[in-house]
Swiss-Prot record:
Gene3D superfamilies: SRCR-like domain. This is Lysyl oxidase homolog 4. It comes from Homo sapiens. InterPro entries: LOX-like_protein (IPR050912), Lysyl_oxidase (IPR001695), Lysyl_oxidase_CS (IPR019828), SRCR (IPR001190), SRCR-like_dom_sf (IPR036772). Inhibited by beta-aminopropionitrile (BAPN). It catalyses: L-lysyl-[protein] + O2 + H2O = (S)-2-amino-6-oxohexanoyl-[protein] + H2O2 + NH4(+). Its cofactor is Cu cation; lysine tyrosylquinone residue. Glycans are attached at residues 198, 629. One of its GO terms (molecular function) is copper ion binding. The lineage of its organism: Eukaryota, Metazoa, Chordata, Craniata, Vertebrata. Contains 1 lysine tyrosylquinone.
Length: 756
């Protein structure tokens, strides 16, 4: 009897008590997941669900091909890399797969080879992790994203208003016109039969407008009839070709997208029955929110968005997106993502003057907030004017954490700004020499931007206008990038932005262009990224650790060398005497979506001989003592001599440590602690008299490193000093309270510590 090689191998493995290599056939219908940082759903430990139990994958023979297949099965476009040796922590339960072998073209892991289910000689210290490209396949819905497109979303993906009246054509953005939908590459009309204001509300929401107004249908009907009587009219030609695609739409008005409405598609061409008998194209008129109205537009009536809303968005890269925060009990707080959906998210978007919600995001996808979690299980019906009108539970009732902070991405009007800026010469699409389009003598012209005064704030506006997220670098020299040959002329100079502008063209700039160094190699450039870190201080720790110390001058030589003492110390009789120091600890969290890293590499760090350490950021924090009217009476600063992960929450591992000239940074979710007993962790108040003051700490004060939100970089406390003792109270980050609450808090004496 002859034995074939496969049969021999099979029998041999059975004699050894080992099952043969197999291809797990059920994996195609079995779920995969990544277990890692909440703010980075595209990376983590790879786990597989088999027989109702989650298990891990061993890193033996795992490489980029296997990572690519896993990422593709998870809905991501590609894999960036993989991680071995349990980089994302050791898993629990079985190790389901070992020696996974893929070619790289498979659509799922079930098409790859392996040892078989549960057959492994690995331990959990070998659990593999993968890092996928954050961009998902078109149409793929993330488990942490609720997307607006419904079952017919592919056909109804694009909607626009085609202006008819001359006045509407001159308006930017277009707020009134005939509704058109794009189908098979062609724009089609929508019949007005049965058209309601609810339909208009949905269309306006999709286009980024918070509300709709009735149109003069009789006037538009006259225009329609007039054009239909003209045999040369393009409209008559389109109608004869049965260009209507949607015969009838029925919306409730709460839908975030027309795809969620009942849609009756018009009969195909060639049918005897006309698509819109006796009707015409549907016409809609929308009202733009305050961000998108022309400057001369009259303010809205009382009771509209002109009132300061009690909801805001934070840490979003684009206008109309961010973590949802609400104002309750005079304090800003977040919203838990339990039962968070597009209906509730749309109420937030419209309240802020945007359109309906494009996405409702869960799991702190746009960073974690601070302070209280005010709301949970928000249940809006869609007609509410504000989020506070919706039924909800208190956030503390169901154990929500800031890992569950809800966020939104709203529909915003197309202002055309993205077509007025571009990047040239970069290695990747997210970087390059900045080129803008401006009008010169009434003619649009492309050119470059002078780099004088160019900084991270201006670069942030540029990246936002480009739709590329946050700016991570603002380049003042761009000789290493070649621009577009016809855009070499400097057409914009003296750019100064506040950071809230939608486009560089809205920033302050020179009238006539004036670039003293003439441009050339000194042209503005940017590097953008879709996510950024976010540093926030622990206010309670500062308040609890503050005390006074009279420190002898003999122990302050190094601190004096690093300018950590007041100027009066220069005139003292060293080493005799002392300085009175207000000391405290600071704890700085990174609640963003990427690690906080120094601006420069290790080769550029400055060595300080006295303290014998490197400074990766020369001025990392400012410490100030202010009078109640804001005048500075004492100051201090702290260089970043050791930017590291002092500690991390359970489930995250420290990645940065300063020992042995190691890499510096703060991992997402971790924190860096500067204890009260280290040098320069103080404010020198030797020359300050008794009184009431404001104690202020600002981290990353010069914006040297990009962050998703700079408004929470400042911490303030009320400070009482009687000449012998000091009290700090009411410590809070700079944007925790509205302005009127700040004034009220200053009058309240909530003394929580008495540390001398």
């Amino acid at each position: 009897m002859a034995w074939s090689p496969p049969a021999t191998l099979f029998l041999f493995l059975l004699l050894l008590g080992q099952p043969p290599p197999s291809r797990p056939q059920s994996l195609g219908t079995t779920k995969l997941r990544l277990v890692g940082p909440e703010s980075k759903p595209e990376e983590g430990r790879l786990e597989v669900l088999h027989q109702g139990q989650w298990g891990t994958v061993c890193d033996d023979n795992f490489a980029i091909q296997e990572a690519t297949v896993a990422c593709r099965q998870l809905g991501f476009e590609a894999a960036l890399t993989w991680a071995h040796s349990a980089k994302y922590g050791q898993g629990e339960g079985p190790i389901w797969l070992d020696n996974v072998r893929c070619v790289g073209t498979e659509s799922s892991l079930d098409q790859c080879g392996s040892n078989g289910w549960g057959v492994s000689d690995c331990s959990h210290s070998e659990d593999v992790g993968v890092i996928c490209h954050p961009r998902r396949h078109r149409g793929y819905l993330s488990e942490t994203v609720s997307n607006a497109l419904g079952p017919q979303g592919r056909r109804l993906e694009e909607v626009r208003l085609k202006p008819i009246l001359a006045s509407a054509k001159q308006h930017s953005p277009v707020t009134e016109g005939a509704v058109e939908v794009k189908y098979e590459g062609h724009w089609r009309q929508v019949c007005d039969q049965g058209w309601t204001m609810n339909n208009s509300r949905v269309v306006c929401g999709m286009l980024g407008f918070p509300s709709e107004v009735p149109v003069d249908s009789h006037y538009y009907r006259k225009v329609w009839d007039l054009k239909m009587r003209d045999p040369k009219s393009r409209l008559k030609s389109l109608t004869n070709k049965n260009s209507f695609w949607i015969h009838q739409v029925t919306c409730l008005g709460t839908e975030p997208h027309m795809a969620n409405c009942q849609v009756q598609v018009a009969p195909a061409r060639g049918k005897l029955r006309p698509a819109c008998p006796g009707g015409m194209h549907a016409v809609v008129s929308c009202v733009a929110g305050p961000h998108f109205r022309p400057p001369k537009t009259k303010p809205q009536r009382k009771g509209s968005w002109a009132e300061e809303p009690r909801v805001r968005l934070r840490s979003g890269a684009q206008v109309g997106e961010g973590r949802v925060e609400v104002l309750m009990n005079r304090q800003w707080g977040t919203v838990c993502d339990h039962r968070w959906n597009l209906i509730s998210a749309s109420v937030v978007c419209r309240q802020l003057g945007f359109g309906s919600a494009r996405e409702a995001l869960f799991g702190a996808r746009l960073g974690q907030g601070l302070g209280p979690i005010h709301l949970s299980e928000v249940r809006c019906r869609g007609y509410e004017r504000t989020l506070s009108d919706c039924p909800a539970l208190e956030g503390s009732q169901n154990g929500c954490q800031h890992e569950n902070d809800a966020a939104v991405r709203c529909n915003v009007p197309n202002m055309g700004f993205q077509n007025q800026v571009r990047l040239a010469g970069g290695r990747i699409p997210e970087e390059g020499l900045l080129e803008v389009q401006v009008e010169v003598n009434g003619v649009p012209r492309w050119g470059s931007v002078c780099s004088e005064n160019w900084g991270l704030t201006e670069a942030m506006v540029a990246c936002r206008q480009l739709g590329l997220g946050f700016a991570i670098h603002a380049y003042k020299e761009t000789w290493f990038w070649s621009g577009t040959p016809r855009a070499q002329e400097v057409v914009m100079s003296g750019v100064r932005c506040s950071g809230t502008e939608l486009a560089l063209q809205q920033c302050q700039r020179h009238g006539p262009v004036h670039c003293s160094h003439g441009g050339g190699r000194f042209l503005a450039g940017v590097s953008c990224m879709d996510s950024a870190p976010d540093l926030v201080m622990n206010a309670q720790l500062v308040q609890e650790t503050a005390y006074l110390e009279d420190r002898p001058l003999s122990q302050l030589y190094c601190a004096h060398e690093e300018n950590c003492l007041s100027k009066s110390a220069d005139h003292m009789d060293w080493p005799y005497g002392y300085r009175r120091l207000l000391r405290f600890s600071t704890q700085i969290y990174n609640l963003g979506r990427t690690d906080f890293r120094p601006k420069t590499g290790r080769d550029s760090w400055v060595w300080h001989q006295c303290h014998r350490h490197y400074h990766s950021i020369e001025v990392f924090t400012h410490y100030d003592l202010l009078t109640l009217n804001g005048s500075k009476v004492a100051e201090g600063h702290k260089a970043s001599f050791c930017l590291e992960d002092t500690n991390c929450p359970t489930g995250l591992q420290r990645r940065y440590a300063c020992a042995n000239f190691g890499e510096q940074g703060v991992t997402v979710g971790c924190w860096d602690t500067y204890r009260h007993d280290i040098d320069c962790q103080w404010v020198d108040i030797t020359d300050v008299g008794p009184g009431n003051y404001i104690f202020q700490v600002i981290v990353n004060p010069h914006y040297e490193v990009a962050e998703s939100d700079f408004s929470n970089n400042m911490l303030q406390c009320r400070c009482k000093y009687d000449g012998h003792r000091v009290w700090l109270h009411n410590c809070h980050t700079g944007n925790s309270y509205p302005a009127n609450a700040e004034l009220s808090l200053e009058q309240e004496q909530r003394l929580r510590n008495n540390l001398i």
